C-alpha cells in the first residue's frame, strides 16, 4: 500500500464529531454508571456489579472467538476455572511459597492463554458443533481434574480465593479493580475489532473463501485470538476466585458456560458493546428474579429464543440507528476510470499466468481435461462455455483452491503453489466470485478494506494496544478503500451496511475489494450476472480500463456480447476441454463454438 492512497481527498461519511458521539454515547453512559455506582453505597448491588464486570472481562475475549470469528465455544467456562484455581492455589501457597495475589492473577491469565490456544487448535480443522463439543469436553475434564487434584485445588472441599491488598482491597476497592479490568478488556478487544485483524476475523466467519482470496491466513489469526481470549478468561477466573472468597468445582457449572455464550448472542455478535450489555443483563436477571430461580434455565432459553426470532442481530442491532436511515431508491453506479492509475500499479513489460495440460477430476467427472491457457498482462482474456464446462473450476485452480491431478501452473515461468489460496495475494492475483461473497453486517467500506489486509504492517500486539503503526495502517487502508470505492462509483455508500446494497452494487463492491490488492492479475467470475444493460456497459468499460493499466484480466462470463466487445482473446471450454481459442472475431465465426455454445 502506498502513501499516495492516503492523500485521496475522498473520505467516508459520518466521520464528524456528531457521528463520533453517536458511536461513543453508549460507552460514555456505561462508564458514568460504573464510576458513580459506589455513591449508592449499597454493598449488595456492588457485589452484583463486581460479578458482572468479571463476566464482562471473560465475555470481551469470548466475543472475539464467538462473535467475530464465528467459533461455537460453549465450554469457555474452562478458562474461568483454570484462572480461578491457578490464582487461588498460587496465592495460598499450595504450589511452593505464597505468591503476591496480583502476580498470582497474572499467572492465571498466562494459564488461560496457554490453554486457550490448546482448546482452540481443533478449530483449525473442526467445524461448528464438533468444535462446540470439544470445548464442552475440555470444560468437563478441567472440572474432574479440580475434583481429583486435592493437594492443589482442595478437591470437593475447595480452596480459599485470594485477597487483594491496597488499593483494591475487598469492597469498593475491589469493585474499581474489576471495573478497570473490564474497561481494559473492552479497550483491547475493541482495538482488535476495529483493526485489520478484526475485519479479517469477520471475513473468516461470513465469507471464508473471500477472506482467503484477500490473503488472510486463518490458522495464525485464530491462534492469536484464542490466546487473547484465554488470557482474559484466566484473569476473570482469578477475580472470580477473590469475589467468591472460597471456590469449589461446583461453582463452575454448565449453566454458567451457557450464560457466557448466550450473552454474546443476546448482545449482538461481532459488536463490542452488545456482549457487555448481554453480560450485565444475564448477571442481574437471576438476582432480581430470585423467586424464579428454579426456572432459570427455562428463562435463559426463552430469552435467547426471543432474541433470535425478534432481533437476530442482538441488542447492538437495536442501537444501530445509522443503518435504519432510508437509502435513495434509484441509485446509479458511475465508475470513475480516471482514478485507476492511483488504485493500480502500472505493470511494465510482459507477464503471464500459464496453465499447461491441467487435469482435474471429481470422482469420475473430468471437470478439466488437459487444459492449456495463458493470461497475459494488459489483456482481457474471456473464458466462455456452457454450464458445467469447467470455467469456474479453472478459476479455482488458478486461485489455489483446487489442486489438479496433472499439469503445471506458472507465473512468469515460476511454479505457483496449489492448495494455499491465501498465498495468491502475495503474487497480486485477485478475484471476484460467481455469487458475491461479502460480510453483510459490515459496512461497504469495511468490506473493501478487507481486501487490503495483507498491506498492513502492524503486528497483532500493535493493533491490540493501538500503537502508532497500527493507526497509520488504518489511515492508509481507509484512504485506499475510499479510493477503490470512488473508482467503481460506490463512494457515497461507504458507510452503508453491505446487506442493504442492491445486487449490482455488490458486484462492483467485489471489484473494489479486489482492487485493494493492486492486482497484477484479476479473475472475474460472471461479474455481469444480474446487471442491467447500462450497468453491463459501464462494467465493460471499467474492465477494459483496468487492463489498460497493465493488469491481466480473466473474465468468465455468459454475456457473449460483453465478451466479444472487450476481450482481446477468448477461450471456449466444453466438457472440461478447450474447444477453441482465438480473437473474438475468430471465435464468433468458429463453427463448433456456434454449434455448442452460441447457437445458430
Identify the meaning behind each predicted range.
Residues 2-337:
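Transmembrane alpha-helices and adjacent helix-loop boundaries
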Residues 399:
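Helix-to-loop junction immediately C-terminal to a conserved catalytic motif
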Residues 522-526:
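Catalytic Walker B motif of ABC-type/P-loop ATPase nucleotide-binding domains
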Residues 563-565:
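A short, surface-exposed alpha-helical micro-motif characterized by mixed small hydrophobic
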